[in-house]
Each structure stands twice: as C-alpha cells, then as structure tokens.
Amino acid sequence: MAAYAGPVDVNTANAETISAELKGVGMSKAKAIVEYRKTHGPFKTAEDLMQVKGIGVRTIEINAKNILVKTASK
C-alpha cells in the first residue's frame, strides 16, 4: 500500500512519507517533524524526534527499525 516501505530518513523524507511509514505518526505530526527540521536543522539521532511536540518515547520505540537518521557530510 505504501510507496516507500523501508526505513525512513527523517532528515530527507516529506510529511507524506513519514506519516505513511511510521506507526502512530499522522499527517499533523509528520508536518511538525518536517517544520522542526526546517527550523532547527537535521536530526542527529532518532531520539531527537522527541523534541517535536507530540512525538514521545513510545513513538520512537515502536518505530525504532523504521527510523533512519542520515546526516549530510560537508
């Protein structure tokens, strides 16, 4: 059903992909993740997602295998 079906790089994925691939993350939370990333820069760890309102430890735990955090090398 989902177009991506694999770990989601939360530093590059759009809100549609994030909401489709991460359990417990709807479009509202997915948009908040993208906005947080635009404002504060890339996430360094999956746990950094907890800085986004509505994302807690449980969301990170149930999606641990589906969250990918890549950082761009400059």
Positions of predicted regions on the chain:
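Amphipathic, hydrophobic secondary-structure cores in small proteins
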Residues: 28-29, 39, 44-49
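Long, highly charged, low-complexity intrinsically disordered interaction regions
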Residues: 1-21, 27-35, 62, 69-74
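Short acidic/histidine-centered micro-motifs embedded in hydrophobic/aromatic stretches
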Residues: 36, 52, 66
